[in-house]
Amino acid sequence: MAASLGGMFTGQPPGPPPPPPGLPGQASLLQAAPGAPRPSNSTLVDELESSFEACFASLVSQDYVNGTDQEEIRTGVDQCIQKFLDIARQTECFFLQKRLQLSVQKPDQVIKEDVSELRSELQRKDALVQKHLTKLRHWQQVLEDINVQHKKPADMPQGSLAFLEQASANIPAPLKQT
């Protein structure tokens, strides 16, 4: 499958050292094309991983802790991050090309995936609507309970003095201190 890429990433600087041997069953989906300047058993994913690790290694490097120039530290970190971003773009490009090939070779598969994504989005939104409806019903019930409580005082005596007496009856008495 990777051989069909035929020099897709030519002109790229040599990658990091290959991963340690002895990783059986490792996917070679992103294996570099013949003639590319990568090590023979390195893949885009391996390079992405090693460049990510190099970003962290440059941040915690003992060389930087021992009083190296700030500009030198910044330059080293920027280079590591730029390399990581370049390899990430290459990896994204690879997957976009595979997606394009799939859409050309099997357009019905792409439509099925789109329909599946739309269905899952509808289910997610339906669940969100149900959640909001539940909250709405709860608050409607709270408001209804408040309205019922305010309608009950109609049988109480009218007037400002009666209202103050009723309001003060609901205030707890102060505790006596000894």
UniProtKB/Swiss-Prot annotation:
Keyword presence, Manganese: no
Annotated InterPro entries: Mediator_Med28
Keywords: Actin-binding, Activator, Coiled coil, Cytoplasm, Membrane, Nucleus, Transcription, Transcription regulation
Coiled coil: 109-145
One Pfam family this sequence matches: Med28
Keyword Lipoprotein appears in the UniProt entry: no
Subcellular location: Nucleus; Cytoplasm; Membrane
GO cellular component term, pick one: cortical actin cytoskeleton
MF term (GO), any: actin binding
Biological process per Gene Ontology, one example term: RNA polymerase II preinitiation complex assembly
Region (Disordered): 1-43
Pro residues: compositionally biased ranges: 13-23
Quaternary structure, from the entry: Component of the Mediator complex, which is composed of MED1, MED4, MED6, MED7, MED8, MED9, MED10, MED11, MED12, MED13, MED13L, MED14, MED15, MED16, MED17, MED18, MED19, MED20, MED21, MED22, MED23, MED24, MED25, MED26, MED27, MED29, MED30, MED31, CCNC, CDK8 and CDC2L6/CDK11. The MED12, MED13, CCNC and CDK8 subunits form a distinct module termed the CDK8 module. Mediator containing the CDK8 module is less active than Mediator lacking this module in supporting transcriptional activation.
Assigned protein family: Belongs to the Mediator complex subunit 28 family.
PANTHER family, sorted: MEDIATOR COMPLEX SUBUNIT 28, MEDIATOR OF RNA POLYMERASE II TRANSCRIPTION SUBUNIT 28
Function (record text): Component of the Mediator complex, a coactivator involved in the regulated transcription of nearly all RNA polymerase II-dependent genes. Mediator functions as a bridge to convey information from gene-specific regulatory proteins to the basal RNA polymerase II transcription machinery. Mediator is recruited to promoters by direct interactions with regulatory proteins and serves as a scaffold for the assembly of a functional preinitiation complex with RNA polymerase II and the general transcription factors.
Protein known as: Mediator of RNA polymerase II transcription subunit 28
Organism per entry: Mus musculus (Mouse)
Gene: Med28
